[in-house]
Every structure is written in C-alpha cells, then in structure tokens.
C-alpha cells in the first residue's frame, strides 16, 4: 500500500503533502486562535491537522518501503540518517493535531459571538505557537536530510 504509485516510490509523492500541510496547518491554527471571527472555523484546522498527521504516517511507512528497496551501500548511511531523524516527525504531527483539538475545545462557545477568557486565549496561543514552531523546525530538518540524501551527490557531480 505504501510502496509504489504508478510505478514510482510513494514516498516521493507523499512527502510533499507533509511538507505543505504540516507548516500550513500550524499557521492556520494560529490564525484561527488570533482572529475571533475565525474561531468557529477551528474544526477545519483540527481536520487539516489530522490530515497532516495521516500524511506524516504515510510518509514514514512509504519511506521504510523505499529504504527496503534500495540496496546501494553508498546510499545506505545517508538514508539511515534520514530515517533516524524522520521517525520522530509523527510525534510532532500528532502533537499539532492534539493541540488543535484542545484549542478548539477551549475556545468554542455556544453563542455566535466568539468570546474567550484571557487565560484560555493565552494558553491556546502559547500551545499552538510552541507546537507549531517545533513541528515546522523538525519538518525542515527531516526534509533537508531527505533532500541531501537524494540530491547531494547528483548536484555535486554537475559542479565539476
């Protein structure tokens, strides 16, 4: 299931969803927290963060399938390093989903005018920012190591 899509490694396709969705959803969640009129749309942020977590899981599984297919001894250490870093991204994605769910539960109101207490708002903002920054930093780190694994030698050979 996570191996190939139309004869190509699924990992090469799925990682783009992670690299786009995880940072996007952290920004969207912060925006929904900051804008009172948008808070009623927080369930969409929760759903988006769930999709980002699912994409992260698919990237992790497809990466393991791809690593199993590669038998180049020169590539193995770089791929192993990438896999070692990438295995933790799912925890950041799940944390972002859980925080968006908690924030939605904290900030939802029964009436149409979204009002919240300052402590709830401050807690929501701090949680959202902290997890979002951590998730984005780790996404960058994983993406950078993956890009280096795939492209470093190819690009180096064009500089000669």
Annotate each language-model stretch with its function.
Residues 1-160:
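Polytopic transmembrane helical bundles with strong interfacial aromatic enrichment
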């Amino acid at each position: 299931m996570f191996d190939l899509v139309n004869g190509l490694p699924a990992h090469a396709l799925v990682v783009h969803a992670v690299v786009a969705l995880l940072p996007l959803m952290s920004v969207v969640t912060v925006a929904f927290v900051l804008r009172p009129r948008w808070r009623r749309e927080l369930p969409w942020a929760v759903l988006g963060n769930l999709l980002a977590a699912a994409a992260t899981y698919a990237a992790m599984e497809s990466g393991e399938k791809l690593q199993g297919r590669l038998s180049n001894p020169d590539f193995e250490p770089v791929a192993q390093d990438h896999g070692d870093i990438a295995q933790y991204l799912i925890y950041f994605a799940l944390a972002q989903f859980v925080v968006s769910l908690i924030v939605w539960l904290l900030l939802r109101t029964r009436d149409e005018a979204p009002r919240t207490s300052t402590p709830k708002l401050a807690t929501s903002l701090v949680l959202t920012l902290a997890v979002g920054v951590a998730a984005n930093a780790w996404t960058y780190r994983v993406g950078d190591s993956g890009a280096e694994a795939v492209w470093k030698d190819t690009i180096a050979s064009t500089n000669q």
